[in-house]
Swiss-Prot record:
Swiss-Prot/TrEMBL catalytic activity: an acyl phosphate + sn-glycerol 3-phosphate = a 1-acyl-sn-glycero-3-phosphate + phosphate
Keyword Lipid metabolism included in the entry's annotation: yes
Source taxon at top rank: Bacteria
GO molecular function terms attached to this record: acyl-phosphate glycerol-3-phosphate acyltransferase activity
Subunit annotation: Probably interacts with PlsX.
Location(s) in or outside the cell: Cell inner membrane
Name of this protein: Glycerol-3-phosphate acyltransferase
PANTHER family: GLYCEROL-3-PHOSPHATE ACYLTRANSFERASE-RELATED, INNER MEMBRANE PROTEIN YGIH
Residue ranges crossing the lipid bilayer per the database entry: 3-23, 51-71, 74-94, 116-136, 140-160, 164-178
Length: 203
């Protein structure tokens, strides 16, 4: 019963869309109405408000970290509990019950989850994102590369033997890549927006 309650709680935590909440609190347009229409930090940055983008990034990462940390802190379900909380909070961000199941792509939330699973895993994955983003200026490309490397880092650190958390990390990576399928098409067509590019007028 504890595992079930923790999983549901993790999903509800994940369902809080900071992109929408922060934008509303700061009097900005709903991020689902412009740019990529994705309620995430990168799209909020297209509004031109860096503070809102940073708050969105921190909030989305924090909720991922919090959901997993709470399960680990109270020892709920061991590694299975951690794996379920990780998947649940991630799915909450992707399909938030509070916002008609229209959520973001999960990059910041996944980063928070990985930091809670193990700081080295989270930092290695975040560093991968930063390196790709710095050199290529594409948030989506950085996310895709980080998603590919996250399971590899996890296996390198912890191995694969009877490790439900490794499967959770792999599942998040697959989901994150799938959520970026439109970005993949734009990258291949040379039409993807670069980091910091503002929303188009009337978009």
């Amino acid at each position: 019963m504890q595992i079930l309650l923790a999983t549901v709680a993790a999903y509800l935590i994940g369902s809080v869309s900071f992109a929408v909440v922060v934008s509303a609190a700061m009097g900005l347009a709903d991020p689902r109405s412009y740019g990529s229409k994705n309620p995430g930090a990168t799209n909020v940055l297209r509004s031109g408000n860096k503070k809102a983008a940073i708050l969105t990034l921190v909030g989305d990462a924090f909720k991922g970290w919090l959901a997993v940390w709470l399960v680990k802190r109270f020892g709920i379900g061991g590694e299975i509990g951690v794996a379920l909380a990780a998947i649940a909070v991630f799915l909450g961000h992707l399909y938030p019950v509070f916002f008609r199941f229209q959520g973001g792509k999960g990059v910041a939330t996944a980063a928070g989850v990985l930091l809670a699973v193990h700081p080295v895993l989270g930092l290695a994955t975040a560093l991968t994102w930063l390196i790709v983003a710095f050199f290529f200026r594409y948030s989506s490309l950085a996310a895709l590369v980080a998603a590919v490397f996250a399971p590899i880092f996890d296996v390198f650190l912890f191995g694969t033997h009877d490790n439900p958390v490794a499967w959770a990390v792999l599942a998040m990576s697959v989901l994150l890549i799938w959520r970026h399928r439109s970005n993949i098409s734009k990258l291949l067509a040379g039409e993807e927006s670069r980091i910091g590019q503002k929303k188009k007028t009337g978009a």
